[in-house]
Amino acid sequence: MQENISVTDSYSTGNAAQAMLEKLLQIYDVKTLVAQLNGVGENHWSAAILKRALANDSAWHRLSEKEFAHLQTLLPKPPAHHPHYAFRFIDLFAGIGGIRRGFESIGGQCVFTSEWNKHAVRTYKANHYCDPATHHFNEDIRDITLSHKEGVSDEAAAEHIRQHIPEHDVLLAGFPCQPFSLAGVSKKNSLGRAHGFACDTQGTLFFDVVRIIDARRPAMFVLENVKNLKSHDQGKTFRIIMQTLDELGYDVADAEDNGPDDPKIIDGKHFLPQHRERIVLVGFRRDLNLKADFTLRDISECFPAQRVTLAQLLDPMVEAKYILTPVLWKYLYRYAKKHQARGNGFGYGMVYPNNPQSVTRTLSARYYKDGAEILIDRGWDMATGEKDFDDPLNQQHRPRRLTPRECARLMGFEAPGEAKFRIPVSDTQAYRQFGNSVVVPVFAAVAKLLEPKIKQAVALRQQEAQHGRRSR
């Protein structure tokens, strides 16, 4: 009896260790895992040893209990409410999960994620728990919607979507901004096909979002995009999007409010010291009568009473590599002076941590190139720089760029002074990821506003399911 238990325990341990290592290798490279294992100090590990052990399914033989426990800490933990979730949602064009965090914070369960960028996937999996029993991870959303395959009918595509994407109450998507072309419309009309979203949006990633909404009919959706979506292609892109969502049978909050203070456009500066405007489209399924008086104007109720300052987000000491080189600083300085003389505002964006009202420009995906849009002042004397740019003493105070960790805080992925958000990628990839992401507390606020509506939608779904069981 003792022998049987021992064999079973060893088999279970082996399976668990192998599965854990496979998950970790989706996030971290072998070099990082070797460093983590050697940090425990119980065995000597090398890249060759780990690779050989993985290839032979024998890594668990070498892993000590302490090493196993340490590696487990490198994986994200389930949310506090696991496994008692209030509703289900999916996360499309997920990036590193900025929108997801807000909806998870109100009790939601993510049941499907789609993200094509392999580096973003690593960061996503490092920070977000994905229940293997209920969560599906996809890379190219077109493999689900079949939009890249010719000759697939809408009915066949819808069935394929239903097979691969679980039922959900809320759809989240930060879809890319692309122009819509009407090329091919006359051909489709000549074939007797109705002119609608399948025509106008074909070939764009928004079309994939539309196909999923149409196939799965979630109670609501939250779509995010850059502010310029409204003016993109002389307004045609936004007009087609709104018409399409209406055709699908959804009411978008504040749809008619398109003035200069459009509530659909939310600036991250209300939550964190970064000017970052994004358009947020919140849609409600018309037949469920959920929208009522919902408006994003109420988001002001969620603004923090005291916004954190830029200084609170910064580390007191950073590595020298984040300080601009003399050559780069001279180039940016002269570039700005040249454009100032021409009367335009092109140039770097210096921010001063000593000023509690400082707000940065928008962090972009190109920040890794030179960091010009957000430079942190380190005491550079402008008057001295005008007289003698190369003054040795002043050169010691050249500005610096943000570190990836500081970018995580500026985007709201972690609080001031924290280092909880895992960044398993290079600085270049991290800058791209944060620059492509959203201000997390903005969408936490949107989720909070939607919480009563989501509860209402879940109650309707449960009533419908109960009624269906009774009628059988």
Curated annotation (Swiss-Prot):
Gene3D superfamilies (UniProt xref): 1.10.260.140, 3.90.120.30, Vaccinia Virus protein VP39
One Pfam family this sequence matches: DNA_meth_N
GO molecular function term, any single one: DNA (cytosine-5-)-methyltransferase activity
Active site: 177
Catalytic activity: a 2'-deoxycytidine in DNA + S-adenosyl-L-methionine = a 5-methyl-2'-deoxycytidine in DNA + S-adenosyl-L-homocysteine + H(+)
GO biological process: DNA restriction-modification system; methylation; negative regulation of gene expression via chromosomal CpG island methylation
Keywords, comma-separated and alphabetical: DNA-binding, Methyltransferase, Restriction system, S-adenosyl-L-methionine, Transferase
The protein's Enzyme Commission number: 2.1.1.37
Broad EC category: transferase
Domain SAM-dependent MTase C5-type, first and last residues per copy: 87-457
Mitochondrion listed as a keyword: no
Family the UniProt entry places it in: Belongs to the class I-like SAM-binding methyltransferase superfamily. C5-methyltransferase family.
Name recorded for this polypeptide: DNA-cytosine methyltransferase
Taxonomic lineage from the root: Bacteria, Pseudomonadati, Pseudomonadota, Gammaproteobacteria, Enterobacterales
